[in-house]
Regions:
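Short, glycine-/aromatic-enriched active-site segment of Class I SAM-dependent methyltransferases
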Residues: 119-133
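SAM cofactor-binding core of SAM-dependent methyltransferases
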Residues: 1-55
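Short alpha-helix
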Residues: 136-159
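Conserved beta-strand signature within the Rossmann-like core of class I S-adenosyl-L-methionine
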Residues: 76-80, 95-116
Length: 193
């Protein structure tokens, strides 16, 4: 398993919930996060944490760590969760192409994407919030996003709102709709090679 923009591997991260012996490579762009994560992981031989910009996944793929962990096996699961709206369209397309060309047949990739907010005012408010914290966001309509992730194929059940895809309760879905009404939905799904 290769995961991008992993954050800190605290509770129920991939290496804790995957079958025993699963090899996991986490990555993040932030060197402080990487340093703390390496301390958390400790000497677990099945888990590595490296610095990498998700917009340039070749940073992990060409580092030697993948061959060390997986050998020649390129049938992998890839996590690209909560990243794409922080990348330009060109960066998303580049990352998806690199990962597709590198991965073996039957590989899977989990991805999520935020749809455009319903009104220009709400879009600007959300954009300004992220700009103020130093992390610009780039809205992509779902039709454009579908083109950017090619040649990956969207697997069943397709890109769905996360609260539907994760089968959250109706109460949770209603709360999300109420609290986030008009700021756009977050969709998630699996891509298959």
């Amino acid at each position: 398993f290769i995961d991008f923009a992993s954050g800190l591997p605290t509770i129920e991260h991939i290496h804790e919930v995957a079958p025993e012996g699963t090899k996991v490579i986490y990555s993040d762009i932030d060197p402080v996060t990487v340093a703390y994560a390496q301390e958390i992981i400790g000497d677990n031989e099945n888990v590595k944490y490296v610095q990498c910009d998700a917009a340039k996944p070749e940073g992990v793929l060409d580092s030697g760590i993948v061959e060390e962990m997986f050998g020649n096996n390129r049938k992998v699961a890839i996590g690209f969760n909560g990243i794409s709206w922080f990348l330009t369209s060109d960066e998303v397309n580049h990352a998806m192409s690199v990962l597709y060309n590198w991965s073996g047949d039957d590989s899977k990739l989990f991805i999520s994407e935020g749809d455009n907010p319903e009104t220009p005012e709400k879009a600007e408010k959300l954009r300004q919030f992220y700009e103020n914290v130093g992390q610009p966001i780039f809205y992509k309509p779902m039709e454009e996003f579908a083109a950017l992730i090619q040649p990956w194929n969207i697997a069943e059940p397709g890109m769905k709102k996360l609260e539907e895809w994760l089968e959250m309760s109706t109460e949770v879905s209603e709360t999300i709709e109420k609290d986030w009404q008009g700021v756009g939905a977050i969709y998630g799904g699996f891509l298959a090679k």
